[in-house]
From Swiss-Prot:
It is an enzyme of class 3 (hydrolase). This is Probable endonuclease 4. It catalyses: Endonucleolytic cleavage to 5'-phosphooligonucleotide end-products. Zn(2+) 1 binds at H69, H109, E145. The lineage of its organism: Bacteria, Pseudomonadati, Chlorobiota, Chlorobiia, Chlorobiales.
């Protein structure tokens, strides 16, 4: 089964996320387990954790279909030793929060070199940061998201993702989340069936489809290779419907969270229905 959902709000507590997901007809969802623009957060309460698990069960959401995202402040490849240490501690806390909620995945952007260190050195720091977090936790898989290549962000090329995966000591706890808008912005063509097929074959050859643990389904506002991360509604951007039709009929995309991060949250229910209508 295809598990389409959206990145839903946790207003009022994390336990409300599965309720939000159910209300839009989702079969998967993403969330922040804390405020994504702050370093510190109150600890999750026992009642909140129990209510989250109960609501997930009631909505039919299994842990492998839920894709929490870490804080936007975390740069696991920071060239500044103090900031790197802070990022590493925060990332471990994010993993621990996911574990407390009984979740199995944590989605994150790799990191940025900020024009202060070489790309390869930054990638080495990111890999080391991931290994430390996996050592400090037990069950959560680190799910690396490809980026649009904006500014000094790394992770926009499959070769960079492969560099990271290759250096993770526990291969059973590393995965990749492919964002369609980021792929397109990075120069990977998705506009036709042949184009997306070619892109996925390249991903399989360089990284490995076995590492695909989730996707973000977003159309793009900007042209191919723009390196600008601007999401558009499904079928309303420069990617078009062929890519989403291919994803909805591809066995590699079965039973992984397929998460909308499109701009209009009021349209998510409609977009979920639209995507399911593409199944053949």
């Amino acid at each position: 089964m295809k598990r389409v959902g959206a990145h839903v709000s946790t207003a009022g507590g994390v336990e409300n996320a599965p309720l939000q997901a159910t209300s839009i007809g989702a079969k998967a969802f993403a969330l922040f387990t804390k405020n994504q623009r702050q370093w510190k957060a109150p600890k999750l309460t026992t009642s909140s954790i129990e209510a989250f698990k109960k609501n997930c069960e009631a909505g039919g959401f299994r842990p492998e279909h839920i894709l929490p995202h870490d804080s936007y402040l975390i740069n696991l490849g920071s060239p500044d030793p103090e900031k790197l240490q802070r990022a590493r501690e925060a990332f471990i806390e994010e993993m621990q929060r996911a574990e407390e909620l009984g979740l199995l995945l944590l989605n994150f952007h790799p990191g940025s070199h900020l024009k202060e260190i070489a790309e390869e050195r930054c990638l080495e720091l990111i890999a080391e940061s991931i290994n430390r977090a996996l050592d400090a936790t037990k069950t959560v898989t680190a799910v690396i998201e490809n980026t649009a290549g904006q500014g000094t962000n790394l992770g926009n090329r499959f070769e960079q993702l492969a560099f990271l995966v290759d250096r993770i000591e526990d291969k059973t706890r590393v995965g990749v989340c492919l964002d369609t808008c980021h792929l397109f912005a990075s120069g990977y063509d998705l506009q036709t069936t042949a184009a997306i097929e070619s892109t996925f074959m390249e991903f399989d050859r360089i990284v490995g489809l076995r590492y695909l643990r989730g996707m973000h389904l977003n159309d793009a506002m900007q042209p191919l290779g723009s390196r600008i991360d601007r999401h558009a509604g499904i079928g309303k951007g420069t990617i078009g419907m062929d890519a989403f039709r291919w994803i909805m009929n591809n066995p590699a995309c079965e039973e992984i969270p397929l998460i909308l991060e499109t701009p209009d949250s009021a349209a998510w229910s409609e977009e979920i229905s639209l995507l399911y209508a593409l199944e053949q």
